[in-house]
Curated annotation (Swiss-Prot):
Annotated binding of ATP, by residue: G10, L11, D12, G13, A14, G15, K16, S17
PROSITE patterns given in the database record: THYMIDYLATE_KINASE
Record's protein name: Thymidylate kinase
Keyword Transferase in record: yes
Role this protein plays: Phosphorylation of dTMP to form dTDP in both de novo and salvage pathways of dTTP synthesis.
PANTHER family listed in its UniProt record: THYMIDYLATE KINASE, UMP-CMP KINASE 2, MITOCHONDRIAL
GO molecular function: ATP binding; dTMP kinase activity
Catalytically driven reaction(s): dTMP + ATP = dTDP + ADP
Matches recorded under Pfam families: Thymidylate_kin
Amino acid sequence: MQSKFIVIEGLDGAGKSTAISFVRKYLEKNNLAAIYTREPGGTKIAEELRNLVLHNKYDEEIHSDSELLMIYAGRVQHYRNLIAPALEKGINVVSDRFYWSSMAYQGGGRGVELSKIRALNNNFLNGCEPDLVIYLDIDPILGLQRAQKVGSPDRIEKAGLEFFNRTRKVFKDLVKDLDNAIEIDAAKSIQEVEKQIYLILDKHFNFQN
């Protein structure tokens, strides 16, 4: 079976880590090799850039365009050094976020032109598209409440409710426009989310239970 690139997307607090644990359980049950990674981050250099974007310790504002470019610098490292080589070796890749997050957070939330983000993806990632995107939809208020229970808010989580409303809108628009994307109501029970993920994997990849 050809290797697959699966991405889990959603607002902070949507339950992406839990969803990835379900994907891992499913792939392992079917004896399918996979690596599990995240963005921002995924490689040593990309993780350094992640820390700068999320926990800026300097007395200097990060411009929206600069934020986008730092994230994309990390994404290029991540894609070329980890994602692409794994897929070429026949290993599945499951990522917590990919370029959709830039479309939603930097495009929708920060107001960066979506055409700029698409250009970065086309020019530096060879227009890479995941085989499957599972988008976990959640009301921003509930998502932020969940995220705050996990730890102190990072720089982006402090952006405010309207920021996350704009971010959510772009996520939902992306789901409507792309055939390889499925939306799950992340406010439902963990058991229901798990069931939906398994059904999605069955449908898209014809894995055997």
